[in-house]
A protein has these predicted regions:
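Bacterial N-terminal signal peptides that target proteins for export
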Residues: 1-12, 17, 21
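Noncatalytic, solvent-exposed loop/strand surfaces
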Residues: 22-413
Length: 413
């Protein structure tokens, strides 16, 4: 999986990051190639069940809420063996689900975490040469790089401590020749960039408040420059991903965050969840503290914002689901609610969108497929037959969903 041209473009900064340089058929990191849950594919399945349209399913040991990633002919997923105190990464053959390699890393797992968390909630990332995983070993944030083809460990490092009574969930975000990790915690927080090939630290910045959050940062191109946008630590902030320099900051709108923001129609759109819940949009072109000047709207309402699920967008509309299962469509520039409907019960997974359809997966494994439009139209509800917490991955006409016990590949064989 060389693709030298794509990699050289990414390293030169022609496009935002390593994930953005991945081929359109790949889903190489959290929420896909742009980190926003959007796929350009047009031939995804709309109907399945445990007995229908399942290309394969592979048993996954242990417990984990991380999402699968797909690159070329490989699928990767992480899990944790709580009793054995091991963090596990598996590499599967994408056409069959056959196990290609597995690596188990001993880790002192945190004894008490939130009931909706797991010891393997961070989604891995890959560039086709290395696979990066993130987990806690005692109080150490631990990053390991494995060889894509063989699974051999290439490097291991501890960027810092992580103190969070609810556990850990910081997914690795590739950018050019770096990987970037959020270290918001109940102590001195940090945002750190490591050289992807070696694990050597490139830059580090302190976060403003000692408050845990669980968000993956998102890389976006704004007004001709790359920005890394991160919610957490009682704020939303934009950074220069090459240097870590703070570009702008908005105070609040709440204390703790799990969902990741998205960028559309020249605005940063985000949901937030504890203790306040709502939907917020920010103009990311300002400098310094822009709380009073660049917040386009802030709608504080529990049914409008997801604490855990991130938003997704198609065309000029944004789609959100609350943790309690209320799906909605909104205007991202004004916050005006277009429609709101119940989509099952509790949701942890972030929705994905492709070919004019939004795929909402609830915790029971039901997938609510809705037209990505300003008029609500439920296309179909499909049952997987297994609880799920991770977000779907999309690749080459197939949908990959991680259940409580299996990884499912949905679509034609």
């Amino acid at each position: 999986m060389g693709f030298p041209l794509l990699r050289s473009l990414a390293v030169c900064g022609v496009w935002c990051g390593a994930t953005l340089a991945a081929r359109g058929a790949d889903w190489p990191s959290w929420r896909g190639p742009r980190g926003d849950g959007r796929s350009e594919e047009s031939n995804l399945p709309l109907q399945w069940s445990p007995q229908e349209n399942i290309a394969w399913q592979a048993a996954i040991p242990g417990k984990g809420h991380s999402s699968p990633i797909v690159y070329g002919e490989r699928v990767f997923v992480t899990t944790a063996l709580d009793q054995d105190e091991q963090h596990v990464v598996q590499c599967l053959e994408r056409n069959t689900g056959r196990l290609v390699w597995e690596q188990r890393s001993p880790a002192k797992l945190q004894s008490a975490i939130h009931k909706l968390n797991s010891h393997a909630s961070s989604t891995p990332a890959t560039d086709g040469q290395l696979v990066w995983v993130s987990f806690l070993d005692n109080a150490d944030m631990t990053i390991i790089a494995y060889d894509f083809m063989t699974g051999d460990q290439r490097w291991r490092t501890v960027p810092g401590k992580m103190l969070s009574k609810h556990g850990y969930c910081s997914s690795v975000v590739p950018y050019k020749d770096l990987i970037i990790i959020n270290g918001d915690q109940d102590a001195a927080g940090y945002l750190v960039a490591l050289v992807a090939a070696t694990g050597q630290e490139r830059w580090r910045v302190a976060r403003p408040n000692q408050t845990r959050s669980y968000c993956a940062p998102v890389i976006m191109a704004v007004a001709g420059r790359n920005q890394l946008v991160l919610s957490g630590s009682l704020c939303v902030a934009g950074y220069d991903p090459d240097t870590g320099k703070l570009l702008w900051m908005v105070d609040g709108p709440t204390e703790q965050f799990v969902s990741s923001p998205i960028y559309l129609d020249e605005v940063v759109l985000m949901t937030y969840g504890f203790p306040k819940r709502g939907l917020c949009a920010i103009d990311p072109t300002g400098e310094g503290n822009v709380t009073k000047t660049h917040v386009l709207f802030n709608v504080e309402a529990s049914r409008r914002g997801g604490y855990v699920p991130s938003p997704v967008a198609q065309g000029k509309w944004a789609f959100v689901v609350s943790d309690e299962g209320i799906g909605s469509c909104s205007d991202p520039r004004t916050g005006r609610e277009i429609w709101s409907e119940r989509l099952g019960r509790h949701h942890s997974a972030s929705p994905v969108v492709a070919a004019g359809h939004v795929y909402f997966v609830d915790d029971s494994g039901k997938c609510w497929i809705v037209k990505a439009a300003d008029k609500f139209e439920l296309v179909r509800v499909n049952e997987l037959g297994e609880d799920t917490r991770g977000s779907p991955a999309i690749s080459r006409g197939q949908i990959f969903i991680r259940g409580a016990k299996h990884l499912f590949c949905i679509g034609a064989k």
